[in-house]
């Protein structure tokens, strides 16, 4: 059985969360059974892990600890929310998934993509999105968006140096080259309506199939 599992990736401030919300509303209006969720989080246990990972006071957190916590949250979220929804025939829209760990911990933290893949292979088994959409934006612009958005709580990753976020973007570029069939890029600097159109053009053929 083919599951309609989509993930959305990008640096901080890329606008993917807004697009996920717009997609959920659009699909619901068309009477498509859809679940929108996020990582880390989406369910109670994973939200508690999220709070630990992203708390600004936890700047001493070791990179491997961070990677393992993300994988633990991912596992619980997957078995408790994502897999049941997919088995029920629902479309799942996930704001971040494994590629965040590959870009942030694998590349930006310097742990290595293959090492993070190994950790996450244990966590997710064979459950992978059929399509991952990467929202590309210059990190300085993304961080400026966050500063301008007074309703968004600043977390530990937002407080990293610009050089860290530049490495995250570099990591995503590596992933685009490594997984070209699954990961597709959209220009997140465009007006939000154009970004939505580009995203929908990628998703619609898979949903209508």
UniProtKB/Swiss-Prot annotation:
Keywords: ATP-binding, Kinase, Nucleotide biosynthesis, Nucleotide-binding, Transferase
Pfam families: Thymidylate_kin
Keyword Transcription: no
Reaction(s) this enzyme catalyzes, per UniProt: dTMP + ATP = dTDP + ADP
InterPro entries recorded: P-loop_NTPase, Thymidylate_kin-like_dom, Thymidylate_kin_CS, Thymidylate_kinase
One of the record's GO molecular function terms: ATP binding
Keyword Transferase: yes
One term under GO cellular component: cytosol
Annotated residues for binding of ATP: 10-17
E.C. number(s) listed in UniProt: 2.7.4.9
Database matches in PROSITE patterns: THYMIDYLATE_KINASE
EC top class, as a word: transferase
GO biological process: dTDP biosynthetic process; dTTP biosynthetic process; dUDP biosynthetic process
Gene3D superfamilies listed in its UniProt record: P-loop containing nucleotide triphosphate hydrolases (3.40.50.300)
NCBIfam families given in the database record: DTMP_kinase
Function text: Phosphorylation of dTMP to form dTDP in both de novo and salvage pathways of dTTP synthesis.
Family: Belongs to the thymidylate kinase family.
HAMAP family: Thymidylate_kinase
Protein name, entry field: Thymidylate kinase
């Amino acid at each position: 059985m083919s599951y309609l599992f989509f993930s959305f990736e990008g640096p901080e401030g890329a606008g993917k969360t807004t697009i996920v919300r717009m997609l959920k509303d659009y699909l619901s209006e068309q009477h498509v059974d859809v679940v929108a969720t996020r990582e880390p989080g989406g369910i109670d246990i994973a939200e508690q892990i999220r709070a630990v990972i992203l708390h600004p006071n936890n700047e001493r957190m070791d990179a491997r600890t961070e990677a393992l916590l993300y994988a633990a949250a991912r596992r619980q979220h997957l078995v408790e929310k994502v897999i049941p929804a997919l088995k029920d025939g629902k479309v799942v829209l996930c704001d971040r998934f494994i590629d965040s760990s590959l870009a942030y911990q694998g590349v930006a933290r310097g742990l290595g993509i293959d090492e993070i893949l190994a950790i996450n292979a244990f966590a997710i088994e064979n459950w992978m999105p059929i399509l991952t959409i990467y929202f590309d934006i210059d990190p300085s612009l993304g961080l400026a968006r966050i500063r301008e958005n007074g309703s968004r709580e600043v977390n530990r990753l937002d407080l990293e140096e610009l050089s860290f976020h530049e490495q995250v973007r570099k990591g995503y570029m590596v992933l685009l080259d490594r997984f070209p069939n699954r990961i597709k890029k959209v220009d997140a600097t465009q007006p939000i309506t154009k970004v939505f159109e580009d995203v929908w053009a990628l998703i619609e053929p898979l949903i209508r199939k």
